[in-house]
Curated annotation (Swiss-Prot):
This is Adenosylhomocysteinase. GO terms for cellular component: cytosol. It comes from Flavobacterium psychrophilum (strain ATCC 49511 / DSM 21280 / CIP 103535 / JIP02/86). The keyword Hydrolase applies. The lineage of its organism: Bacteria, Pseudomonadati, Bacteroidota, Flavobacteriia, Flavobacteriales. It comes from the Bacteria. NAD(+) binds at residues 163-165, 197, 226-231, 249, 284, 305-307, 352. The gene is ahcY. Pfam families: AdoHcyase (PF05221), AdoHcyase_NAD (PF00670).
Length: 438
């Protein structure tokens, strides 16, 4: 579809009357997002994103609304869709629409609507100007532009990617020689992956399961599939609730970390039959298969906190046992296998946004401050980059962390000149080499 044949739709949300509620929650979130608010204050006069038309595809939550309005405060025009069919908070989408921003998102999208919403973000206003920047989470927007709208690519200065799955897709494109613009990998900034992925999941994983099921977690046997940053936060989340946690892993380093953090590390086949809750965190496909479902005990809860729904073999489950499916409530479904009930949360999609409201505002401020800095960097300096995947430099990573310290009452020591010289760093940083692993 070309610009000329795509009609202008100002917005599409579930219920615009929710805007006042959403605005109150946005104002509350702003107080917990010091990084974004600091960037608004720092750049309000400079307007570093003036002229940028940023199409965003990222969970349309209250916290994302603060990001959107930060990008606009820095001079950008913005359109938005959600990267997950269940993750939109309808009051947030309504508030953004009421502010005159093109947003296309509501909770409970079907797949055709999901694609339609992304497509609407490619063109701006009634004059249908095309996007010139991408802000993505998972790669669906990026892939749509490159694969279905290649004529738009030349006008795009760059893209920033939020999550592990999307970054993996970008590196696949680099390897295949099909990435046509520079990209910044926001996910692997220290202040994203070690905070959003870990500390965010530490709070939101348990929150989602509790809201969905009202189950008592203390004493329950939980299997966490994967022990990367998301898995680490998820395992800690359930252990903090008193659950007995077992981890599964393919990576010997992550497996050793899990063991030395005090978790048993076992093969899924050996523990699936005794688990009360199984949660996937890997970013890979086909983790929980039909053979695993057949071993599960009655009332096992199965969910996923990775980006896509293919970590759990929902296709097998629906093909073989779909006739038994009963919706308990939205995003909580019961399947019956050989007389045993299995509870699936959020249809195998991202459980913390499908069954709850995702990560807390403060930790999302870390991630979204990185996103904002990445957009500024690519918009102002895209000519300095090749068609490859880049990281934000260390000094910006440290800046993101610094902007969040005062909110927590943190006081930093200051290096003397001789101390800085002794360890080979500047008095004002960066304080660690690029290869340092936090």
């Amino acid at each position: 579809m070309s610009t000329a044949t795509m009609p202008y739709v100002a917005f599409k949300v579930k219920d615009i009357s929710l805007a006042a509620w959403g605005r109150k929650e946005i104002e509350l979130a702003e107080a917990e997002m010091p990084g974004l608010m600091a960037l608004r204050a720092e750049y309000k006069n400079e307007q570093p994103l003036a002229g940028a038309r940023i199409a965003g595809c990222l969970h349309m939550t209250i916290q994302t609304a603060v990001l959107i309005e930060t990008l606009i405060a820095l001079g950008a025009e913005v359109t938005w869709s959600s990267c997950n069919i269940f993750s939109t908070q309808d009051q947030a989408a309504a508030a953004i629409a009421a502010a005159g921003i093109q947003v296309y998102a509501w909770k409970g999208l079907n797949e055709p609507d999901f694609d339609w919403c992304i497509e609407q973000t490619l063109f701006f206003g009634e004059d249908r100007k095309p996007l010139n920047m991408i802000l993505d989470d998972g790669g669906d927007l990026t892939n749509m532009v490159i694969d279905r709208y290649p004529h738009l690519v030349e006008g795009i200065k760059g893209l920033s990617e939020e999550t592990t799955t999307g970054v993996h897709r970008l590196y696949e494109r680099v390897k295949a020689g099909t990435l046509p613009m520079p990209a910044i990998n926001v996910n692997d900034s220290v202040t994203k992956s070690k905070f959003d992925n870990k500390y965010g999941c530490k709070e939101s994983a348990v929150d989602a399961v509790r809201r969905a099921t009202d189950i008592m977690l203390a004493g329950k046997r939980v299997v966490v599939c994967g022990y990367g940053d998301v898995g680490k936060g998820t395992a800690a989340s359930f252990r903090g609730a008193g659950s007995i946690v077992t981890v599964t892993e393919i990576d010997p380093i992550c497996a050793l970390q899990a063991a030395m953090d005090g978790f048993e590390v076992k093969k899924l086949n050996t523990v699936v039959g005794n688990a009360d809750i199984i949660i996937t965190t890997t970013g890979n496909k086909d983790i929980v298969l039909g053979s695993h479902f057949e071993q599960m005990k009655d009332k096992t809860i199965v969910c996923n906190i990775g980006h896509f729904d293919n970590e759990i073999d929902m296709a097998w489950l629906n093909k073989n046992h779909g006739a038994s499916k009963i919706e308990i409530k939205p995003q909580v479904d019961k399947y019956t296998i050989a007389g045993k009930d299995i509870l699936i949360l959020a249809e195998g999609r991202l459980v913390n946004l499908g069954c709850a409201t995702g990560h807390p505002s403060f930790v999302m401020s870390n991630s979204f401050t990185n996103q904002t800095l990445a957009q500024i960097e690519l918009w102002k300096n895209s000519a300095a980059y090749n068609n490859d995947v880049y990281m934000l430099p260390k000094h910006l990573d440290e800046k993101v962390a610094f902007l969040h310290l005062a909110k927590l009452g943190v006081e930093l020591e200051v290096l003397r000149d001789d101390q800085a010289a002794y360890i080979g760093v500047g008095v004002d940083g960066p304080f660690k080499p690029e290869y340092y692993r936090y």
